[in-house]
Amino acid sequence: MKEQLKGLLDQAQINLSEAQIEQQLALVGLLDKWNKAYNLTSVRNPKDMLTRHIMDSLAVRQYLHGQRFIDVGTGPGLPGLPLAIAEPDNEFVLLDSLGKRIRFIRQVCHELKLTNVTAVQARVEDYQDEKQFDGVISRAFASLNDMLSWCEHLPAENGRFYALKGLYPQDELEQLPEQYKIESIEQINVPGIDASRHIVIISKRS
C-alpha cells in the first residue's frame, strides 16, 4: 500500500516526508480497524481509503492560507487529520457532534503523536473558541448557505471558508448571502477518483 500511496502523491505533485507517508498509512490502518466496530465510513477497502479519504483530503492543501484551521463536521477526521499530518506547523481543530468520531480522532492523535490537532465534540453553531480561525473547512457537511449561517462566528477578519464539493454547486452559489463573496472556485483533480471535485473559497465582504 505504501507504493500505491507514493504513486498517488507523485501524480498529485504532493511532497510528504517518509515519516508523514508512514503516518498517513497508519491513519488508514486505524480507520480500517475502528470502522469494523464503529462504522465511521462507508468506504470499506483500505486501498480505496487512500484515494477517497487521504488523497481527496490532501488535494485541498495547496489552497489553504493561514496557520489555524477548523474542520467542521469532520466525521472521522477528514480532511483534518491528513492535512494535520502534512502540515505539522499548522493548528487544526476537528469538530463533530458524534462521540465515537471524536474518540477515534483522539486515539489517532495519541498513536501518531499528533500535537497540532484538537478534537472537539460539539455542534458547530454552539462552539466558541478564544481565537478565531484563518480557515473554516467543510467536506460533505452542509449546503453553502447552512455552512455560512452556522459557522459565521468562526473565521477571523480576513479568514476564509473552504467548502469541498462534488459537482459544481450552481444552485447553492446562486443563493449565497449578500455579505459573502466568492474568492474562487477550483476544480480539483484527485488521482484515482474519476468523480467531479470542487473547492469553493468564500470570504466576508469588507
Swiss-Prot record:
Localization per Swiss-Prot or TrEMBL: Cytoplasm
Annotated binding of S-adenosyl-L-methionine, by residue: 73, 78, 124-125, 139
UniProt KW keywords: Cytoplasm, Methyltransferase, rRNA processing, S-adenosyl-L-methionine, Transferase
Keyword Transferase: yes
Reaction equation(s) it catalyzes: guanosine(527) in 16S rRNA + S-adenosyl-L-methionine = N(7)-methylguanosine(527) in 16S rRNA + S-adenosyl-L-homocysteine
EC number: 2.1.1.170
Record bears the keyword Nuclease: no
Cited InterPro entries: rRNA_ssu_MeTfrase_G, SAM-dependent_MTases_sf
UniProt xrefs under HAMAP family: 16SrRNA_methyltr_G
Designated name of the protein: Ribosomal RNA small subunit methyltransferase G
Species per Swiss-Prot/TrEMBL record: Idiomarina loihiensis (strain ATCC BAA-735 / DSM 15497 / L2-TR)
Upper classification of the organism: Bacteria, Pseudomonadati, Pseudomonadota, Gammaproteobacteria, Alteromonadales
The gene coding this protein: rsmG
